[in-house]
Swiss-Prot record:
<comment type="similarity">
    <text>Belongs to the SdhE FAD assembly factor family.</text>
</comment>
<dbReference type="InterPro" id="IPR050531">
    <property type="entry name" value="SdhE_FAD_assembly_factor"/>
</dbReference>
<protein>
    <recommendedName>
        <fullName>FAD assembly factor SdhE</fullName>
    </recommendedName>
</protein>
<dbReference type="GO" id="GO:0005737">
    <property type="term" value="C:cytoplasm"/>
</dbReference>
<comment type="function">
    <text>An FAD assembly protein, which accelerates covalent attachment of the cofactor into other proteins. Plays an essential role in the assembly of succinate dehydrogenase (SDH, respiratory complex II), an enzyme complex that is a component of both the tricarboxylic acid cycle and the electron transport chain, and which couples the oxidation of succinate to fumarate with the reduction of ubiquinone (coenzyme Q) to ubiquinol. Required for flavinylation (covalent attachment of FAD) of the flavoprotein subunit SdhA of SDH and other flavinylated proteins as well.</text>
</comment>
<dbReference type="InterPro" id="IPR005631">
    <property type="entry name" value="SDH"/>
</dbReference>
<keyword id="KW-0963">Cytoplasm</keyword>
<comment type="subunit">
    <text>Monomer.</text>
</comment>
<dbReference type="Pfam" id="PF03937">
    <property type="entry name" value="Sdh5"/>
</dbReference>
<keyword id="KW-0143">Chaperone</keyword>
<dbReference type="InterPro" id="IPR036714">
    <property type="entry name" value="SDH_sf"/>
</dbReference>
<dbReference type="GO" id="GO:0006105">
    <property type="term" value="P:succinate metabolic process"/>
</dbReference>
Amino acid sequence: MDIDNKARIHWACRRGMRELDISIMPFFKYEYDSLSDDDKRLFIRLLACADPDLFNWLMNHGRPEDEELFRMIKLIQNRNKDRGPVEV
């Protein structure tokens, strides 16, 4: 997926679990544009993961074996925490 195709990335952010939408959609909306190109590619790679894995990782019930994916999970968690709650 092209890092500049925001419509397609936005669609990929929409998950089957409300809990994931609450974490991923605000991060995309408020933070994606400020990411480096490498981190944008990493975020897109994270979106290819299965919903149950994403849910567990974002809820701190385990972590991905891939350290770069883990770094992106932590970035999402930290930026969402710093920003505070927003409407989805």
